[in-house]
Amino acid sequence: LRDATFAPPRALTQLAQITDFDLFVSTTFDSFLEQAINAERFQGAQSTEIIGYSPNRVADLPTERENLQRPVVYHLLGRVSASPTYVISDEDTLEFVCALQSEHLTPEKLFHELEYNHLLLIGSNFSNWLVRLFLRMAKRRRLSDPRDVGEVLADDHSGSDERLMAFLQQVSLRTRIYSGAEGFVD
């Protein structure tokens, strides 16, 4: 996979064109987002900074978001590598999520940025409970607590998940749901 030359999906190319976005958190282990950003912003030059989380080696942002010199793609669930340091199963997901909640294994600068900035979760295929857990981890407080920033979920299934919708309507009024990742970036 590391040497494969697949083209990034059109939705990622469109997302990469939004130059106000400089910090991307990916839950996939592929390099499509990196390729799209490099193609759209740097004429294909390898200029995007790539960081991959691993429970056995915490990698954090090099600096606060406002001081980033170039776009960053942070692979929250790992990235393709020779060693098994990326998520490919439900058990892997569980281990990564548990590690991310551990005081000593949390990328602090990244989670500070997630806590104090608006979030766009686009195209994820997280289950109902994983969406809830990710939002809670990112915001570092109860979702029902008042906050100045909101979240947008743009995917193919969250809007039709009645239990997730009921939960978000009850406790997270700042979260907005849009149907379809590709339609959202159009």
Language-model-derived ranges and their functions:
Residues G52-L61, S89-E108:
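Active-site glycine-rich loop that binds ribose-phosphate moieties when present
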Residues T28:
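Active-site glycine-centered loops adjacent to acidic/histidine catalytic or metal-binding residues
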Residues V73-A82, Y86:
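Class I SAM-dependent methyltransferase SAM-binding "motif I" and its flanking Rossmann-like core
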Residues F6, R10, Q17-D22, E40-Q46, ...:
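SIR2/sirtuin-family catalytic core signature
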Residues V25:
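Basic- and aromatic-enriched surface patches that contact anionic nucleotides/nucleic acids
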Residues S54, L77-V80, S179-A181:
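Residues at the C-termini of beta-strands that transition into short coil/loop
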Residues L1-T5:
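Metal-dependent phosphoesterase signature
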